[in-house]
Amino acid sequence: MPGTAEVQVRPGVEEDLKPLTDLYNHYVRETPITFDTEPFTPEERRPWLLSHPEDGPYRLRVATDAESQEILGYATSSPYRAKPAYATSVETTVYVAPGAGGRGIGSLLYASLFDALAAEDLHRAYAGIAQPNEASARLHARFGFRHVGTYREVGRKFGRYWDVAWYERPL
């Protein structure tokens, strides 16, 4: 697995659909990090991909191995809520491929994402982190997020309830 010097971060494109779906499905099947409980097909994920264009407030940034072009992770900004008054708020997520953790991929992705969002008319970014997840909490703290509350036992997956800690960051 490459170090961060051999990683490129770029906007997500249509050709990324299958590997991004495979990466996400790992988290669906194996972890409580996402509260989706059934894996997706690439076609089911296509609307998600298309909802993150190259510009605007809702972005998809993809980290790839510079040589092999293997996807190492991705970060998104998505609508926080559907109602119009929330339009200047986004929810951010970051997913790192199994085996690529601990190499700074998440930091590269978030740096790229927040650089891309700097020119947008946005006020706040929010991130929900299923607990426990110390690595994600540290990543978010490094990028200026602060813990604002925890929803207790808000989701049920794998036969148990999970808390979600919420973090916010000014943009």
From Swiss-Prot:
UniProt EC number: 2.3.1.183
Gene coding for it: bar
InterPro entries: Acyl_CoA_acyltransferase, GNAT_dom
Similarity comment: family membership: Belongs to the acetyltransferase family. PAT/BAR subfamily.
GO MF annotation list: phosphinothricin N-acetyltransferase activity
Keywords noted in UniProt: Acyltransferase, Antibiotic resistance, Herbicide resistance, Transferase
Pfam families in the cross-refs: Acetyltransf_4 (PF13420)
Name of the molecule in the record: Phosphinothricin N-acetyltransferase
Reactions listed under catalytic activity: phosphinothricin + acetyl-CoA = N-acetylphosphinothricin + CoA + H(+)
Protein purpose: Inactivates phosphinothricin (PPT) by transfer of an acetyl group from acetyl CoA. The physiological substrate could be a structurally related compound.
UniProt keyword Transferase present: yes
Residues at which acetyl-CoA binds: 94-96, 102-107, 133
Lineage: Bacteria, Bacillati, Actinomycetota, Actinomycetes, Kitasatosporales
One biological process term in Gene Ontology: response to herbicide
PROSITE patterns: GNAT
Domain N-acetyltransferase: 7-171
EC main group: transferase
